[in-house]
UniProtKB/Swiss-Prot annotation:
Record-stated family: Belongs to the glycosyltransferase 4 family. MraY subfamily.
Full protein name: Phospho-N-acetylmuramoyl-pentapeptide-transferase
Main location: membrane
Gene giving rise to this polypeptide: mraY
Cofactor(s), names only, from the UniProt record: Mg(2+)
Length: 354
């Protein structure tokens, strides 16, 4: 809407992506901060509480009365702010909005099933949820390849030129990146605020890359891939950052609400989507280092048990391992935040070191 006001009324300041991204950030933050306590009160009244996994550390038993599905509020705030501030004719923006909405809907169906069944196992089956994720990721990849004309060029960190062009096979690569990113954030979302700050760090880094890749002068100077029109996605990125900050106000320890799958699946998928459109699919390993470690811990744990009948960790994902080792929850959370910050600083150095 604001972008079209610039077109109609010739309000030049609204032409700037940075201005509209700033407005979207504050709009999403205040919308989330205003509606979240009302959602918490409603959820408590409806007993929409987070079912606790029976094998979870004992400290988690006290959280069984905490409302979940807070992701509905901050994703809705993100979508409203994006609709208000972004150029809705931009294909990258349309794809980003569809990504947030679609994965949040998948997460909502899973959350609702768990709440209705009063069990952590009562949601969608892992196979069904995975198929939905793959299907939506494939659709988004088709949009990027056919309608956004996104190149299939493959880049790696610290090297300025594309290694090769995946051509049509880029669709399947992007599909895997978006799906993997969605699940990795979902696995990380196990402690109060643990997924929120690393997500914000990742989105800030990706927002910088997206803006620079969409800018003809900066992309040429820094030897970044030029992606025409992708800079507009910054509006959606910073709307989501503002919304997550608004959510964190109520999710910091001790949490008053959890984001649930309706939040974590959506945030993770959008991080993957943003990495794809900025041609940073491999750099996502550094940008989302905490998410990668959490996911690897689960893969190693399951693989080790199936092959060796032995577990590597006391419990996976790895943040539960540290809980069972006696670490305080706050210590785990803050240390993971520090790791995420360092990883993203390293990722940003690739802007010049290439």
């Amino acid at each position: 809407m604001l972008y079209f006001l610039y077109k109609i009324l010739n309000i030049n300041i609204l032409n700037y992506i940075t201005v509209r991204a700033g407005i979207a950030f504050f709009a999403a933050f205040f919308l989330t901060a205003f509606f979240m306590p009302r959602f918490i009160a409603w959820a408590k009244n409806k007993h929409a509480n987070q079912p606790i996994y029976e094998l979870a550390p004992q400290s988690h038993k006290a959280k069984n009365k905490t409302p979940t599905m807070g992701g509905i509020v901050f994703i809705t705030a993100t979508l409203l702010s994006s609709l208000l501030c972004s150029n809705l004719t931009n294909t990258f923006v349309i794809g980003g909005i569809l990504c947030l909405f679609g994965f949040s809907f998948i997460g909502f169906k899973d959350d609702y099933g768990k709440i209705a069944g009063h069990s952590n196992h009562a949601g969608m089956s892992p196979r069904k949820k995975f198929m939905y994720q793959i299907g939506l990721s494939f659709a988004l990849s088709i949009i990027l390849f056919l309608f956004a004309n996104l190149s299939g060029e493959f880049f790696i960190p610290f090297y300025k030129y594309a290694l090769f062009n995946l051509q049509f096979f880029a669709i399947f690569f992007w599909m895997l990146v978006i799906t993997a990113s969605s699940n990795s954030v979902n696995l990380t979302d196990g402690l109060d605020g643990l997924a929120s700050i690393p997500s914000i760090f990742a989105l800030v880094s990706l927002g910088i890359f997206v803006y620079l890749c969409g800018h003809s002068v900066f992309s040429a100077y820094l030897f970044l891939p030029k992606v025409v029109g992708v800079g507009e996605l910054c509006v959606v990125i910073f709307a989501l950052i503002g919304a997550i900050l608004g959510f964190l106000w109520y999710n910091c320890y001790p949490a008053q609400v959890f984001m649930g799958d309706s939040g974590s699946l959506s945030v993770g998928a959008f991080i993957g989507y943003t990495g794809v459109v900025s041609k940073n699919e491999i750099l996502l390993i550094i940008i989302g280092f905490v998410f990668v470690i959490e996911t690897l811990s689960v893969i190693l744990q399951v693989g080790s048990f199936k092959i060796r009948k032995k577990r590597i960790f006391l419990m996976a994902p790895i943040h539960h391992h540290f809980e069972l080792k006696g670490w305080n929850e706050n210590k785990i959370i803050v240390r993971f935040w520090i790791i995420a910050l360092i990883a993203n600083i390293i990722a940003l150095t690739t802007l010049k070191l290439r």
